[in-house]
Structures are given as structure tokens and as C-alpha cells.
Amino acid sequence: MHEYSIVSALIEQCEQHAQANHADKITRVDIKLGVMSGVEPSLLQTAFDTFKLDGICNAAQLNIQIQPLVILCQDCQTESVLSERTVVCPACQSFRTRVLDGEDMLLMQLEMEQNED
């Protein structure tokens, strides 16, 4: 299950941001997950809940925004937003399309807290 290695890298990235901002705690992690990313949201959530226990993210809530697939047809120049995993243009049925969005997983926002000593 590659979700474990993805979550490990995500938590490491969160820890780096927290350290750079002198934060002691991360309370929320917002990510954008493309439908073509190859990552299963429920497995990602389970992996996050498991890995967060031993670090600065232990109280963090993971919010996953699913990013639909956005394609541009090279034949008819139609830009389409698709919720399913297909690269066929719905306007002209061409396979000559380019993916514009929906393939990545991106860290969008962190909510952090600092102790006031």
C-alpha cells in the first residue's frame, strides 16, 4: 500500500512547515487529491490516522478535497471537467487529450499553533 509512504512524506512536509513557522502543533491539514493520482482517499485517511500519532500532527484533522479530472482536447479545443477516470473528450470522443489537473496530491493549507511561553 503506497498510501503509507505518501503519508510519511506528507507528515514530514508538515513538520518542516511547522518548524519553519515555530509551531508546536498542527491542528488541520488540507490536501487536494486528484482523481487520477492513484491514491485511494479512505486508505490515505487510515494511513494518516495511524502515522500522525507519534508527532506534531497527532491532533491534526486531515481534510481531503477531491480534484476532478480536467482535460483539454487537442482536436476540438474543449476543456472538460470529469469526475471519472477517463481521458476521452466528451464533446468529440477524441483520445487526443491533455490532462490539465486532477493527477496530483497537493498540500494546500496547514493550521498550526504556537505555545506562548
Curated annotation (Swiss-Prot):
Keywords: Metal-binding, Nickel, Zinc. Ni(2+) binds at H2. It comes from the Bacteria. Pfam families: HypA. GO terms for biological process: protein maturation; protein modification process. Involved in the maturation of [NiFe] hydrogenases. Required for nickel insertion into the metal center of the hydrogenase. This is Hydrogenase maturation factor HypA.
